[in-house]
């Protein structure tokens, strides 16, 4: 981290919201409680360390960040620590690149959403077709949501969508230094 950046972002040393563990309903509750206890004006810092979890919870937390930024005009900084995997990267995508930081040695994990589903075909043929179509609709909608998140994550960076789309199926691990050089984060502290 440069001296200029250190002076510009002294709050990184004392985050307002500290999240760790699985991205789930319990994390969302903690996030909301900590956010409610934050100062009502000025810049905020949110940190996360996670091996992943529920991407929809990550999107909900990200929406809260976006709403605060847009309706209150507040700057909110993201600080990823140690591991920002999967749903953690989904949460990070809610922050503009210029408001993202990682600690030294942190790794990002970007991958495609996963699904495990058994489809039981039983009954009248038209009902079977409807069941198959419903499952296909679920997958197609999930792919669209995933691609929206990928585009948010790389917006303002040097990473082309096609590169992320190519690497995500095999779990793309990105070290902090590489994330900075790719423009996915502003700096490393």
Q: Language-model segments: which ranges?
A:
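Terminal-region recognition feature
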Residues: 1-189
């Amino acid at each position: 981290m440069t001296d200029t950046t250190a002076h510009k972002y002294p709050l990184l040393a004392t985050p307002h919201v500290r999240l760790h563990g699985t991205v789930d309903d319990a994390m969302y509750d903690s996030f909301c409680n900590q956010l409610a206890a934050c100062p009502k004006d000025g810049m905020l810092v949110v940190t996360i360390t996670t091996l992943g979890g529920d991407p929809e919870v990550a999107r909900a937390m990200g929406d809260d960040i976006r709403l605060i930024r847009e309706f209150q005009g507040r700057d909110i900084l993201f600080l990823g620590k140690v591991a920002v995997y999967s749903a953690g990267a989904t949460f990070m995508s809610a922050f503009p690149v210029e408001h993202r930081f990682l600690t030294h040695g942190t790794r990002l994990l970007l991958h495609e959403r996963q699904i495990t589903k058994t489809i039981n075909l039983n009954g009248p043929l038209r009902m079977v077709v409807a069941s198959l179509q419903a499952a296909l609709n679920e997958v197609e909608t999930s792919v669209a949501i995933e691609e929206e998140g990928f585009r948010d994550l790389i917006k303002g960076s040097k990473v082309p969508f096609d590169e992320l789309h190519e690497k995500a199926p095999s779990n793309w691990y990105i070290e902090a230094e590489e994330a900075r050089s790719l423009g996915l984060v502003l700096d490393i502290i």
